[in-house]
C-alpha cells in the first residue's frame, strides 16, 4: 500500500542497469495482470540499447529521460495473435477487429498492464514515468518496433533507478473522483478548492515553479484546434482498427 500511495514520476535516472531478474519479474507481473476473457490483447516490447532509446526519445518529442532510463517499455494493443487464431480456424477477422469496442478493449488492457508494471517496478525501488507521446510519430514507431497489422503502440514507460526525489503532485479531492452509487456532476466547488491547492504547489515546488492552476492547465491543453497526435487516425486505419459503425 505504501508503494501505491507514494507514486511519483521520475525523469532523471542513475547510470545503472536494471538487473535481469528484476526486469523478468516486472514482465511476469505484466502477463499476470487482468485481461478480457484471457485473450491477452497486449504486448510489451523491451528497448534497452542506448542508440534505440535515443531514437525513441527523439520520436517522443525530445524527451531526454527516455534515453537516460536504462529500460524503455513500449506497450501495444495486440490483436495479431487473435488474427492468427481466427486464420487457423478459417474465420474472417477484419470486419470484427475494426469495430471500435475492440480498440477500447486493447486500450483498457494496455492501461492495466502499464499500471501493473509501474507498481511492480516501484516495489523494487525503481522509478518510472509513462510516455503517451509514443503516438506522436506513430508510423516511425511502428517501423522501429517492426509492428505488424493489428498491433498498435499505445504507451511507453521509462524504468530505472531514480536520480531525483521530485515529490508528489497533489491529486483531485476524493469526492471529485469517487462516487457512491451514481455520478455527481456538482464539481465546481471541489475544482475551486483543488485549484487553490494546485496553485500553491506550482508556485512553491523547487523545480519549474510557475503561476497557474489545474483548470487553467486543463483548458490550455485542450484548447482548439486540438490535434495532439495527428498521425493517429491514419495509423489506426493502417493497423486494422477503423470503426465501421
Name what the model sees in each region.
Residues 1-245:
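Acidic, surface-exposed loops and disordered segments
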